[in-house]
Amino acid sequence: MLKLFGWAMMTAVAVGGTLSLARAEAMNAAAPVCRAGGSPAILVEVIGVRSDAGTVRVQAYGGDPARYFDKGTYIERIEMPTAQAREICVPLPKPGTYAISVRHDANGNGKADMKDGGGMSGNPQFSVWDLIVKNKPDPKQVQVHVGQGVTPVRVVMNYVQGGSFRPVATR
């Protein structure tokens, strides 16, 4: 399996360095939903992950926008090794309006700490203060309208760097 994964990675780089849905399918059990294209889903492209260590968690939120990102209110959650998490298919129950959060647990300890990265659909800007007091973005900034099919969403990861929370160089 590792040889197959290595071969797939080398092929992706040789063909242009982009990740494809085929690679996402190999890493994400929900990817066939995105490949088929007939069911509501979000294909999350994770940009700017600082390292391949740890895990990446993608959560989808629906329903009341005031409850987006509240603990335990997600409707779908996918977690996978960071090295395999660049395109992640998130199946959804029906067309509608959703929000996405992505967390990079850089040290894989399962706890939020200053080494972790994060991002949301719409890529709202956050300050370190926002993180400390747990401010949430305006729902209109993060909403994704999903129809009967696959909706692509690009999420740029941010990390605490000095006194700010911002993207690192894109990988």
Model-assigned labels for residue ranges:
Residues R57-Y61, S101:
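Beta-strand signatures of extracellular beta-sandwich domains
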Residues I78-Q84, H145-G147:
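Short proline/glycine- and polar residue-rich coil/turn motifs
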Residues I42-G48, V58:
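A short, amphipathic beta-strand motif
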Residues D105-M114:
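Acidic, glycine-anchored loop motifs typical of Ca2+
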Residues G96-V102:
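A short tyrosine-centered beta-strand micro-motif
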Residues A8-T18:
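Bacterial N-terminal signal peptides
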Residues E25-V33, P124-G163:
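Extracellular beta-sheet/turn segments enriched in Thr/Pro/Gly and aliphatic residues
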Residues R86-L92:
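Exposed aromatic-hydrophobic patches
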